[in-house]
Curated annotation (Swiss-Prot):
Protein name, UniProt field: Sugar fermentation stimulation protein A
Keyword Magnesium: no
Cited NCBIfam families: sfsA
Recorded family membership: Belongs to the SfsA family.
Domain of life of the native organism: Bacteria
Record GO terms (molecular function): DNA binding
DNA-binding region listed in the record: 201-220
UniProt cross-references to InterPro entries, sorted A to Z: SfsA, SfsA_C, SfsA_N
CDD domains given in the database record: SfsA-like_bacterial (cd22359)
Protein's UniProt keywords contain Repressor: no
Gene name of the encoded protein: sfsA
UniProt entry keywords in alphabetical sequence: DNA-binding
Described function: Binds to DNA non-specifically. Could be a regulatory factor involved in maltose metabolism.
């Protein structure tokens, strides 16, 4: 996936009110960007980081500029727009770049399922195969080269794991897919030090037949694509 039109560069001043960030452009203008990320964004929003942003042609938007990527002062690229996790995963499935999810004839998005009335990110279907339910999570928290999810306690994420366990128990295929959107990450684990309950549920889910996949994106200011399978340690 290529960014079109090309992203523009600025330097981060501050992120605030969760959804806003002030930046300064190379020519000295100060802009307020929309920040499409409600998470803690630990390590993704340090003053002085390079920000790559897009600009909407919708003249009715109060904040027409959207923060897409951070380029940290150590050089790592991080996708902070959480919408891209699903877009990149869908693209990779359709391109059959994820071998574990290839061979299906139908892909549906946002399908209602489960006792808790969740919406699964993707459902794959094919003749003579069980339906495949896929929940996607965006991974941007890094400590050295170790990637973690979540970056804050997530009751919603816990609910999704319970739903996936029920799917697996019914004989369907259940997959939790971690889209790693930080170029410095080389391996993945649940963030037990942040959300112990989530880590426990992830281990339980694997024991009950839920598949755990982690794929890393190649990221630059020109574009992104999920390319490489990473090892997962529970």
């Amino acid at each position: 996936m290529e960014f079109s039109p090309p992203l523009q560069r600025a330097t981060l001043i501050q992120r605030y009110k969760r959804f806003l960030a002030d930046v300064i452009t190379p020519d000295g203008r100060e802009l307020t960007l929309h920040c499409p990320n409600t998470g803690a964004m630990t390590g993704c929003a340090t003053r002085g980081d390079t920000v790559w942003y897009s600009t909407s042609d919708n003249t009715k938007r109060k904040y027409p500029h959207t923060w897409e990527l951070t380029q940290s002062q150590s050089g790592a690229f991080i996708c902070v727009n959480t919408l891209w996790a699903n877009r990149l995963t869908k693209e990779a499935i359709l391109n059959e770049s994820i071998s574990e999810l290839s061979g299906y004839s139908s892909l549906k998005s946002e399908v209602k399922y489960g006792a808790e009335r969740s919406r699964i990110d993707f459902m794959l279907q094919a003749d003579s195969r069980p339906d495949c339910y896929i929940e996607v999570k965006s991974v941007t928290l890094a400590e050295n080269e170790q990637g973690y999810f979540p970056d804050a306690v997530t009751e919603r994420g816990q609910k999704h794991l319970r739903e996936l366990m029920n799917v697996a128990a019914e004989g369907q295929r259940a997959v939790i897919f971690f889209a790693v959107l930080h170029s410095a990450i080389t391996r993945f684990s649940p963030a037990r030090h942040i959300d112990e309950k989530y880590a426990q549920l992830l281990s339980e889910a694997q024991q009950r037949g839920v598949e755990i996949l982690a794929y890393k994106a190649e990221i630059s200011a020109e574009g992104m694509a999920l390319k490489k399978s990473l090892s997962v340690t529970l």
